[in-house]
Amino acid sequence: MGAKVVAIASGHRDRAEAVAKEFGIEHVAGDWRELVAHSEVDLVSIVTPPSTHIEIALAALDHRKAVLCEKPMALNAGEAARMVEKANSMGVLALIDHELRFLNSRRVMRGMLQSGAIGIVRHCNYVFRSDYRGIADRAWDWWSDEAMGGGALGAIGSHVVDSFRWMLSAEVTDVLGMLSTHIKQRPDKTTGGLREVTTDDEAKLLFRFSDGPHTQGATGAASISVVESGKYENRFEIYGSKGALMVEETGELWISPTGSGAWRPVQVDQDHMARGMREGSWSRGFTAFAVAIVESLRAGRTTVKDAATFEDGYRVQLVLDALRASNESSCWVSVKQD
């Protein structure tokens, strides 16, 4: 790929040093400010809790570094808007890590949808099921803390919303959200006692979409859980006037023409995955995304084809904010459009 990791920073310097030793990273810092100011750094990858994203991103952009920011982009749309404004003013590459866009199966799915293979979209359904945080004895961490941006809605719901927007080329106009916290306390590693969990571990979401070239009166639903046992699922379904498309965690893509009553496979090229990464859609998507980022940086471009920009991150954040407001009011909420 022709890229080199030249520096790593962590609040836990000992961990950073261990990673640096394993992968031959020359510069180690206990403060991210050293990293974003380093002369050899071209791209800053922000993989810290969401509450820290805005400060790190703004500083990196001030140093004219390209930025790849983990999702959710920020704690709220106000913070995200500031990040967009700064990125636009500096004119550098600024992306959100929505790597699922780079899976071959999803790219083929989007191409088929846009070519009219299933007609006008009527409904979308997204299912994410994992027991990643299903064990109550798992220690309290930032994922358990609302103030730090933890929770299933931000971590997984952001991917769901981005998938809807990118796949349909439409905006979310209205939402209804129900967030739940099933494991309400977790062990504190410092005190040994139990600490309150202030974030959601399940989300049930409904959506309405704007009309566009592929949508007319379209609706959507999502079921997200990180405390559900059983088979791990990351499944996206789109139902149209002429048929349906479905992509699964495995990368398999299926089509069901209206009236057929069955799914049939769609041939998709296998995704490549970097050595040493854990098997899964996230790793396969990120491998392709990373290659595209490096190619753009080498070419001096400030965009990456198909990648989620800071503007996309802001749009997703508007939807997440509306979903949280809906959960509080138990009512449908309109998403801010500007």
Enumerate the predicted regions with their spans.
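N-terminal Rossmann-like dinucleotide-binding module
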Residues: 1-23
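Active-site loop of classical SDR/Rossmann-like NAD(P)-dependent oxidoreductases
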Residues: 11, 247, 277-291, 308
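Beta-loop-alpha module in the N-terminal Rossmann-like domain of NAD(P)-dependent dehydrogenases
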Residues: 12, 23-86
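A short helix->loop->beta-strand "cap" motif at the edges of active sites that frequently abuts
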Residues: 25-26, 63-65, 90-92, 214-218
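C-terminal helix-rich "cap/oligomerization" subdomain common to oxidoreductases
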Residues: 43-46, 81, 292-338
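Rossmann-fold dehydrogenase core element
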Residues: 82-100, 119-126
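Predominantly a Rossmann-like dinucleotide-binding segment in NAD(P)-dependent oxidoreductases
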Residues: 100-197, 330
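Contiguous beta-strand/loop segments that form the cofactor/metal-binding neighborhood of enzyme cores
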Residues: 162-254, 290-298, 302
